């Protein structure tokens, strides 16, 4: 027999290994299980063929031996003795209980079927199952369970390998637990059967063929069990980690998620996430816990004890740091009517949803059926000054009020309107996210937020169903606006369509910022004009001018018939990417209102005069006018008078009259405001009593 015939070839790398090797020298792949050794490999003298034939029926190497076969018998090499897998048709060795390729269970053979014998001159194999061959199959099954297949190059690696030895692909985390369980179960069954057969087989065998001491076998099997237990243990640890993370997530509340989103937003530069957490009433000084750091799973960015301020300093977010430090220094809990009365607020939201209808016809735009205008109650003036200050701190946005009044004379710049005509405007506080425009519109009408995105849905559906109408107005207006600034250019229709598709997409995304076109559509949904008082320039947090805002002006529902719309407008304020509702306070209605103010002698009606000119007495722009509607200032003033109840005050200011009535207002809104105001009335007596006592003491002195 030649040397090439004695060696066995590896089925993975084809390397020729020595017969005593149990693994491939090159790739460490296990030796394929086949026939058993039929001669003593360590004899000094070479046996003849006759002795081989005499000893073929009684193998010399028992299950406890670590040696591997040298010469394969004719029985094991006969192809017809193999069984075909019913799943993948692979030919497996007769002793295999599972398919080598797909690990599917061997089909149970019927009593009529019998394996074909080779019919050669060799003696037939005895009917009892050979413990050595049984051991080979079991060993192969264990080895199969100790390996994992690389998903990139399909190479089988050892279980303890962290990455593929061929392509360095990492070990997959999702190990097949079913395969490991089946392998372990099958191995335990074979072990029990093997031990029972080994007791019977070894008792009747010759003393010269007795196996070596079992310490070698036990050590090998212990090593295999350790490898398999390590693989199972690592999977158990992975499952425990997943279970722990799931428990942490189940304990998380909405505020916790907003806090984590704010932390990630600082790292990634997302200001909206920080503002969402801030407006929800979250604690700016909150620190990251160990569970939260584990859930974020970014040790390089997050650490236990970090706050939003720490993260802003670490990642050099100067703009976010300015907002956070301002919030820490001026932290005041907000208390608006919608927060105090959640039950009434939900009923109002249902009323709004029920009042949304779609107009039949060519212009199938959605609209609201009710005319509601929110005003602050006049009873606030009856509260003590300290209580009034507390109320205004909790319901108003002081930063917006200061920017619109002091930094730029945008609102309340006329003493005539603010004092004598009681038309002072107040900026209500709302969420500083992308929904601020929709929130401010509902606050100016119903006094609540667009929490359920009812108004956003109506906005998106109106833009989608009436896309042709709004698209024509938008395209014509954008072209004229660019030319008015001396920008003479033309866009392809594909570019116009892309920009319009972006505007449509913003309307469908909750939290997305909205543009001038969306205000124009909202004016049609409300069926009333919208006046926006805003800053003229975009500015950075350092005060640097970045560009024009283009939001200030009047938005008329030009695509409706005038008879279908109301002439009482609402007012919004715009400051640095944020919209706020501008509302007035109720008045008694019997003061001298100036020239042109007709109150119909109804004391219950509150009239607020909204200026249609800026502080320089220039007429506000009317957005989205067509070429036929564009004209000089007199023509635009005429158009404003057609769509709104306008008058000129004694000071010569052109104003639009916003009329509201507590008696005609929606009863749910009235109940909500009264319940909110009762909370401040309850703290009035103590303060009033102490002030009265001090006044009496002063008089006595």
UniProtKB/Swiss-Prot annotation:
Task: Name the SUPFAM superfamilies on file.
Answer: Ran binding protein zinc finger-like
| CDD domains membership | OTU_ZRANB1
Any idea which UniProt keywords this protein has? Answer: ANK repeat, Cytoplasm, Hydrolase, Metal-binding, Nucleus, Protease, Repeat, Thiol protease, Ubl conjugation pathway, Wnt signaling pathway, Zinc, Zinc-finger
For the protein in the UniProt heading, the enzyme class is hydrolase
One Gene Ontology biological process: protein K29-linked deubiquitination
Q: Where is the composition biased (Polar residues)?
A: 108-121, 202-214
In short, the EC number is 3.4.19.12
Which parts of this chain are annotated as the region Disordered?
Answer: 108-129, 198-219
Indicate the principal place this protein occupies in or around the cell: cytoplasm
Quickly give the catalysed reaction.
Thiol-dependent hydrolysis of ester, thioester, amide, peptide and isopeptide bonds formed by the C-terminal Gly of ubiquitin (a 76-residue protein attached to proteins as an intracellular targeting signal)
Its annotated compartments are:
Cytoplasm; Nucleus
Query: What's said on domains?
Result: The RanBP2-type zinc fingers, also called NZFs, mediate the interaction with ubiquitin and determine linkage specificity. RanBP2-type zinc fingers 1 and 2 (also named NZF1 and NZF2) specifically recognize and bind 'Lys-29'- and 'Lys-33'-linked ubiquitin. RanBP2-type zinc finger 3 (also named NZF3) binds 'Lys-33'-linked ubiquitin and shows weak binding to 'Lys-6'-, 'Lys-48'- and 'Lys-63'-linked ubiquitin chains but it does not interact with 'Lys-29'-linked chains. The OTU domain mediates the deubiquitinating activity.
Task: Say what the protein does.
Answer: Ubiquitin thioesterase, which specifically hydrolyzes 'Lys-29'-linked and 'Lys-33'-linked diubiquitin. Also cleaves 'Lys-63'-linked chains, but with 40-fold less efficiency compared to 'Lys-29'-linked ones. Positive regulator of the Wnt signaling pathway that deubiquitinates apc protein, a negative regulator of Wnt-mediated transcription. Acts as a regulator of autophagy by mediating deubiquitination of pik3c3/vps34, thereby promoting autophagosome maturation. Plays a role in the regulation of cell morphology and cytoskeletal organization.
Protein name (record) = Ubiquitin thioesterase zranb1-A
Q: Which organism is it from?
A: Xenopus laevis (African clawed frog)
């Amino acid at each position: 027999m030649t040397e090439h015939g004695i060696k066995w070839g590896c089925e993975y790398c084809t390397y020729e290994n020595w017969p005593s090797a149990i693994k491939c020298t090159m790739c460490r792949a296990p030796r394929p299980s086949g026939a058993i050794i039929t001669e003593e490999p360590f004899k000094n003298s070479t046996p003849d063929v006759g002795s081989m034939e005499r000893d073929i029926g009684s193998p010399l190497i028992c299950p406890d031996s670590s040696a591997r076969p040298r010469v394969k018998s004719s029985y094991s090499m006969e192809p017809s003795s193999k069984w075909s897998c019913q799943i993948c048709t692979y030919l497996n060795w007769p002793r295999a209980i599972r398919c080598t390729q797909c690990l599917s269970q061997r089909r149970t053979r019927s009593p009529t079927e019998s394996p074909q014998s080779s019919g050669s001159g060799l003696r037939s194999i005895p009917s009892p199952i050979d413990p050595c061959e049984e051991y080979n199959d079991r060993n192969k099954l264990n080895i199969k369970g100790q390996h994992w297949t690389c998903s990139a190059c399909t190479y089988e690696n050892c279980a303890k390998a962290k990455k593929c030895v061929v392509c360095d692909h990492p070990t997959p985390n999702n190990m097949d637990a079913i395969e490991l369980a089946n392998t372990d179960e099958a191995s335990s069954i074979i072990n029990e059967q093997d031990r029972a057969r080994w007791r019977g087989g070894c008792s009747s065998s010759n003393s010269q063929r007795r196996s070596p001491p079992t310490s070698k076998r036990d050590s090998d099997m212990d090593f295999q069990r350790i490898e398999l237990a390590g693989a199972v243990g690592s999977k158990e640890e992975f499952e425990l980690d997943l279970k722990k993370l799931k428990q942490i997530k189940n304990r998380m509340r909405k505020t916790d998620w907003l806090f984590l989103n704010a932390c990630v937003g600082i790292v990634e530069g997302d200001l909206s996430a920080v503002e969402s957490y801030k407006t929800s009433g979250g604690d700016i000084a909150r620190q990251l816990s160990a569970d939260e750091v584990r859930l974020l799973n970014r040790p390089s960015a997050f650490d236990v004890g970090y706050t939003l301020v720490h993260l802003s300093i670490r990642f050099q977010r100067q703009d976010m740091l300015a907002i956070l430090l301002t919030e820490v220094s001026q932290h005041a809990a907000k208390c608006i009517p919608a927060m105090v009365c959640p039950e009434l607020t939900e009923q109002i939201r249902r009323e709004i949803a029920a009042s949304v209808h779609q107009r039949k016809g060519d212009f199938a735009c959605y609209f609201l059926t009710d005319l509601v205008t929110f005003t602050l109650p006049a009873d606030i003036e009856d509260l003590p000054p300290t209580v009034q200050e507390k109320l205004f701190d909790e319901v108003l946005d002081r930063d917006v009020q200061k920017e619109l009044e002091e930094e730029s004379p945008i609102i309340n710049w006329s003493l005539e309107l603010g004092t004598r005509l009681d038309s002072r405007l107040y900026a209500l506080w709302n969420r500083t996210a992308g929904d601020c425009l929709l929130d401010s519109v509902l606050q100016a009408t119903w006094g609540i937020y667009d929490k359920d995105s009812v108004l956003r849905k109506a906005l998106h559906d109106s833009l989608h169903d009436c896309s042709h109408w709004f698209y024509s107005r938008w395209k014509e207006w954008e072209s004229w606006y660019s030319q008015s600034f001396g920008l003479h250019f033309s866009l392809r229709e594909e570019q116009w369509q892309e920009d319009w598709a972006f505007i449509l997409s913003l309307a469908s995304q909750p939290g997305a910022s909205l543009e001038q076109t969306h205000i124009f559509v909202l004016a049609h949904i409300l069926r009333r004009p919208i006046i926006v008082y805003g800053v003229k320039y975009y500015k950075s947090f350092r005060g640097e001018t970045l560009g024009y805002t283009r939001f200030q002006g009047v938005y008329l529902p030009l695509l409706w018939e005038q008879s279908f719309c109301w002439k009482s407008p609402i007012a919004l304020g715009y400051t640095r990417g944020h919209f706020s509702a501008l509302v007035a306070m109720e008045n008694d209605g019997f003061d001298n209102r100036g020239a042109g103010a007709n109150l119909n002698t109804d004391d219950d009606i509150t009239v607020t005069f909204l200026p249609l000119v800026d502080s320089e007495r220039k007429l506000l722009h009317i957005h989205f006018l067509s070429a036929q509607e564009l004209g000089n200032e007199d023509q635009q003033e005429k158009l404003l008078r057609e769509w709104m109840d306008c008058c000129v005050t004694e000071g010569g200011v052109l104003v639009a009259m916003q009329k509201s009535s507590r008696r005609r207002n929606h009863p749910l809104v009235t109940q909500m405001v009264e319940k909110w105001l009762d909370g401040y009335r309850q703290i009035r007596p103590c303060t009033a009593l102490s002030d009265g006592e001090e006044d009496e003491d002063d008089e006595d002195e």
